Design a protein with these regions (language model features):
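Pepsin/retropepsin-fold aspartyl endopeptidases
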Residues: 1-139
Length: 139
């Protein structure tokens, strides 16, 4: 079996709603257009979620995605429309399930576990205020 070297990307925490938080830049290809967006790394979130305006800005009819519901912090459910999209974090490119919602009530995107965390060993270092993504062989 051939092994490939893993890559490590280190991201300093950035502000999210006035607090230093584990934020990472990720490339996402929406309707054939690559853009970079900031994501809050949320190990408690199943799906990666973005506000619907990101899809609309790229010309994607997000409501053509598979409709599902995501539970948010106050316990309520919001509708999300799921799409399989190319993403890139550091040098690792992969396909991920991304949900778009008009009801996402936070000002930042969420990077969830589904289709994302399997590609990385992710370490939160609270004292240093950094999050590291180390690529791993998967699937």
């Amino acid at each position: 079996m051939r092994k490939t070297a893993s890559r490590v990307s280190v991201y300093p925490y950035d502000l999210a709603n006035g607090r230093l938080s584990p934020m990472v830049p990720a490339g996402i290809c929406v309707a054939g257009r690559w853009r970079v967006a900031q994501f809050y790394v949320d190990s408690g979130a199943f799906y990666t979620l973005m506000h619907a305006t990101h899809a609309v800005d790229c010309g994607l009819d997000f409501k053509k995605g598979r409709k599902s519901y995501a539970q948010v912090g106050d316990g309520s459910l919001i509708p999300v429309f799921l799409h399989r999209l190319p993403m890139q974090i550091g040098g690792k490119r992969f396909e991920a399930t991304v949900g778009f919602s008009e009801k996402l009530g936070i000002r930042f995107n969420l990077l969830g576990r589904q289709d994302v965390f399997q590609h990385f060993k992710i370490c939160f270092h609270e004292r240093r205020k950094v999050v590291t993504f180390q690529t791993v062989e998967c699937c």
